[in-house]
Amino acid sequence: MFKNYLKVALRSLWKTKGFTAINIIGLATGLGVCLLIALYVLEELSYDKYNPKADRIYRLDAEIYFNNTLFNAATSPRPLAVTLMKDYPQVEQMVRINYFDNQSDVMIKKGGDWVQDHRLAFADSTFFQVFPIPLLAGDPATALKEPHSIVIDETAARRYFNSTDVVGKTLELQGNTLCKVTGVYRDIPSASHFHFHFIRPLRDSWMGDDNKWLSNNVASYILVRPGTDRAALQKRVDATINTYLNRELQDVFHISSRDMQQQGSYFRYHLMPLVDIHLHSDRSYEFEPNGNINYVYVFSCIAILILVIACVNFMNLSTARSANRAKEVGIRKVAGSTRGNLILQFLLESLLLSLFSLLLAIGIALALLPVFNHLSGKELPMGAIFSARLLLVLLGLTILVGCLAGSYPAFYLSSFQPILVLKGRLAAGFSSSWLRSSLVVFQFFISIALIIGTIVIHDQLNYIHNRRVGYDRDQVLIIHNGYAAGNGIKAFCKGLPMISGVADATLSGDMPTQGGGYNQNAWWKSPAIDAKSTMVLTNLYVDDHYIPTLGMQMAKGRNFSPDYPTDSGGIILNESAVALLGWKDPLREKLYQPDDSMRPKAYPVIGVVRDFNFSSMHDKIGPVVMTLTDNRRNLAIRLRPGDIHSCVNKIEAKWKAFANGVPFDYTFMDDDFNKLYHAEAQTGQLFIAFAVFAILIACLGLFGLVTYATEQRTKEIGIRKVLGARVTRIVALLSRDFARLVLIAAVIAFPVAWWAMSKWLQSFTYRTEINWWIFPLAGAVALLIAMVTMCFQTIRAALANPVSSLRSE
């Protein structure tokens, strides 16, 4: 019996090949896109959950508000975690990590050549107790206990030794530092908020034994015992800070923590759950750029909406097609079929369609996965698509859609009286459906909203790239490993002016396109070092060529100059710092910092530089102080217009002559600037892709419905042509109702899209306006696409021979 049902179902689907193909392709596309987005969302939600202790690990994050300056960071004082573990038995273990992304480069000797590598961290010996990453070689309990030891990941072991059995071997690091390999750990999973390639003992870091409570220079993680109450633990953290920090506040600022709080300033440290870091933390000194929970919500909604569009299409076309089968139902009933037989037949056809769609959807997902990975910046493996849990959910959803789509014709058509059906009294009422029109409106509402979102994101990215940022990022080459060249870097810089294509060059510690990681230091307005005169400013360590090389403009005063030996003790402020300090004539003012003996040292202001963006445009320009330094981490070279490629080759040749085998590792500043908005650019690309798929699915459904409508009105079209109606008139007649539905969808989409994109733009301090023309443009694009889709079928119907259509009736 079932075999017979299956054979009849397949014959029926084959008989209407066009509808069958549209139905399968539409639903498969929706399911395939939904599957890809589901993989993305699941990956984002799984961060750090590979750690079996993840739900018991917290990071201690700083929130410091001092004299109208807020400082949020993923760092804390070095003694905090140690003190908590000593004083609070609920803290089972702790680890402190020193890692700054823009300072994590490391030079390693391989063969006789120096190799530039990345992601070197310093950590306590308890690292592998808090983060139990499997070791392929070595003892996790002792691997980081000895000074000058190093633990490396599997990839690094194979890169430098072609093996993972390397415990006891030596790596030579820049500065004649020999490190003994004491462990090799598996590559850290992609869904982790850090990906260190090398880990050295914390005591080997540049901090030494800095145990000041006012220095936030490590990321501190604590592992608590099962059942620990988070609120009680937070109170313990607050009490510890008040006790120990108070002593240093009185020594340095001559104020107690209580008095400081009464003035509105505070030092707070929050417990950030490990599993929340990736999606809920966006602080200074994050190990890596984190995700955004709002994007997870947005993409989840888009996946649901695209799937709904596909399902609506599927059900729309299934019910429309079934209207032509009313007479078939009547004949089957006359021939002896029961209502149950008919219900089973219709449901089986619908389920077959949906299951075929699922198989095609998996193929679509596999084909699009490399493209999706490129657009989203993910590295989702092919095998993730075949996750049993995910496929079971999709299978269940597919069966549900098939049952819903088949239920209307199954239960409605099977209830018809044969005599009425065969007389044709039900066809007219069945063919017109307000529900079908509503579903078309819904489909194009989503499509138009996505088009508007895509245009707004594109406009904001254009605004970012065209807005004046206070420096000239064009034709600036940055060498990021200048420190590694040692003393050779100065000789290299002296030789740069001899290259005809070089305009200027600067050695500095910080670049405005590095995206964060700047030092935040306390400065005082008066020699009386106290809390009231304290300002927290961003310190940029520069030389006298920094401002001209980067094309910055002076607002007052002058730049640093070798003609003034006293400039080594001078400072340059930006306009925001002057405004914060409230100075009318800053060139007559001084700022102070304590020297080694805690006596105030004066730094006269010699100039004011115009404000420039030294972080992304999500953030407001903050107060900056520039000081002269011998820092050699970054070398920026401004190139003259002309043959850039030839000039870079000359610079590289000179670099090799002075850099003692250190590789020539460079980027261009405009590329670094673009990386600051990589996440927004990816979002824009994904929105374009989603909008294209949404429109494609909607148009497939529209094409099917127009085809159905023209089939229903074949006789009417023939009569109109016999009576002299023009082709254009008939096309307009057939398209008018559907065009009206698209316009209704546009009217609904406009306010919703405006609200959603306004909320998104609020995440930028500097943002574009939503232009009014975006809305009619999006509506016109959707209408044009819909008209092209409809015209293909309506013109064919209008050009058909009326004799043939009337004879068939």
Where would I find each of the regions flagged by the language model?
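Alpha-helical transmembrane segments of integral membrane proteins
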Residues: M1-I24, Y285-E288, S318-L355, L366-G486, ...
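Mid-to-C-terminal secondary-structure elements
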Residues: D124-A137, H148-G291, A491-A679
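Membrane-helix entry/capping segments
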Residues: M1-R11, K15-F19, N51, T243-I302, ...
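Hydrophobic alpha-helical transmembrane segments of polytopic membrane proteins
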Residues: L390-P409, I448, F693, C699, ...
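Hydrophobic alpha-helical transmembrane segments of multi-pass inner-membrane transport and secretion
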Residues: K15-V41, G291-K327, L355, L435-H458, ...
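Membrane-proximal juxtamembrane linkers immediately C-terminal to transmembrane helices
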Residues: L35, L39-E63, P89, P134, ...
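Hydrophobic, regular-secondary-structure patches
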Residues: E44, Y58-R119, T126, R158-S163, ...
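Transmembrane alpha-helical interface segments in multi-pass membrane proteins
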Residues: I331-L369, A694, K715-S758, L777, ...
